[in-house]
From Swiss-Prot:
Record EC number: 2.3.1.-, 2.3.1.20, 2.3.1.22
Domain of life: Eukaryota
Activation/inhibition comment: Acyltransferase activity is specifically inhibited by TMX1 at the endoplasmic reticulum, restricting accumulation of triacylglycerol.
InterPro entries referenced in this protein's UniProt entry, alphabetically: Plipid/glycerol_acylTrfase
Keywords: Acyltransferase, Endoplasmic reticulum, Glycoprotein, Lipid metabolism, Membrane, Transferase, Transmembrane, Transmembrane helix
Membrane topology, from the record: Multi-pass membrane protein
Subcellular location: Endoplasmic reticulum membrane
Positions in the Cytoplasmic compartment: 72-125
Protein name as catalogued: DGAT1/2-independent enzyme synthesizing storage lipids
Known role: Catalytic subunit of the alternative triglyceride biosynthesis pathway, which mediates formation of triacylglycerol from diacylglycerol and membrane phospholipids. Synthesizes triacylglycerol at the expense of membrane phospholipids, such as phosphatidylcholine (PC) and its ether-linked form (ePC), thereby altering the composition of membranes. The alternative triglyceride biosynthesis pathway is probably required to provide the energy required for rapid growth when fuel sources are limiting. It maintains mitochondrial function during periods of extracellular lipid starvation.
Amino acid sequence: MTNKNQSFGVGQDSMSSMTCLIHVLEAWFGVEHLEDYWNFANYLLWVFTPLLLLILPYFTIFLLYLTIIFLHIYKRKNVLKEAYSHNLWDGARKTVATLWDGHAAVWHGYEVHGMEKIPEEGPALIIFYHGAIPIDFYYFMAKIFIHKGRTCRVVADHFVFKIPGFSLLLDVFCAIHGPREKCVEILQSGHLLAISPGGVREALMSDETYNIVWGNRKGFAQVAIDAKVPIIPMFTQNIREGFRSLGGTRLFRWLYEKFRYPFAPMYGGFPVKLRTYLGDPIPYDPKITAEELAEKTKDAVQALIDKHQRIPGNIMSALLERFRNKQKINQKTL
């Protein structure tokens, strides 16, 4: 009985302290009924928080469409120059890269560790883990263009090419949907190429445990062997805390396997700390098989996850990392 009375007393003290604080603030600011305002603000927060969590991911899509509108304006402004210049889109790429790099810095404090592993010239195949929304790769492409002056081609899922309005964006930033022969041709021409073997399936079905969802895919490894290029593994810390997908549920798994379209809803858009880590390049080896190279690459990406990612991921911890400085050793950070 005594314990209950003590607990009740503690509750009363807490309420009295809050009431007292509100009265002090009312007297200080000369505002009446401050407690009612406070309760109303709490009610609004309770009502709108779920809505905000669902809207934030679509802000990224909004930014993509703003980029597309800018590219259309740029194209029409330079319609006469197009016939005379092979570098028509360089100015647009530079502008868009600067805008996305600014967004990365402000919203995520974005960093790239190991940029020196990207060659100044010549080909390389970049293999990366696919987040629910691969916004980290947009930021990474912007960094490469700004600091290396290079455009990184990327293999995108076929459904992306069917999104209304995206065709110009994909053309300007050199996205392709394969096939393998085209990938080999791009690399043999001396370009950078990025592939996420997990693709949309990994985006939907992986989660805060950061499990790699590649299945038996090894086509990317055969591309690297045929083109005789190194593979650079890549992983972005906290990418699953920025955006979360509900695609791992049975219904959305079935819908994806049936229609090959990502119907699963997403939530997030949280301003978590994002750090992209580039692993040591896996050099070309004429004696290795595609199966062995695929497994070796998967192990390299997994090693980056094990080293740099808290498992399971935690949104609050990822947010707090914005205010912590990690010591950077023996790696160039951008």
